[in-house]
């Protein structure tokens, strides 16, 4: 069993620890800048023990909602989908026109996940991870699946 709650209802140290454990730091670096995920709006999936088992963060800027991070600790249980739906609803209520997000070329699971949920390729930024790596040198060169981490892929979805 899980419940979805806004990140601002969770002790900040729990969010900081979650991102540090899964990303090495609460900072998310993409070519457009560095974001402190533990300080962003978002939602967390929490199990019956109060442990965070998934988290999504986002920003809203005018008519755009940008998802900065989405993590699910247990695959294929609907956690990522439930979190994504929460942000999509929030974006609708904020009168956003689209939701966008960036992932990297090595993240084949995320690429499939977003396409199955109606997100489309909007752009590919070759070698963009080099810029992000200058901001956050901890970004590895090669993913666990053996793919070089090199390009950023922008996905977007128009909000009805």
Swiss-Prot record:
InterPro entries xrefs: Acyl_CoA_acyltransferase (IPR016181), GNAT_dom (IPR000182), N-term/lysine_N-AcTrnsfr (IPR051556)
Pfam families referenced in this protein's UniProt entry, alphabetically: Acetyltransf_1 (PF00583)
Every N-acetyltransferase domain range: 2-140
Domain of life: Bacteria
Leader sequence segment: none
Single GO term (MF): acyltransferase activity, transferring groups other than amino-acyl groups
Protein name: Uncharacterized protein YdhI
Organism listed in the record: Bacillus subtilis (strain 168)
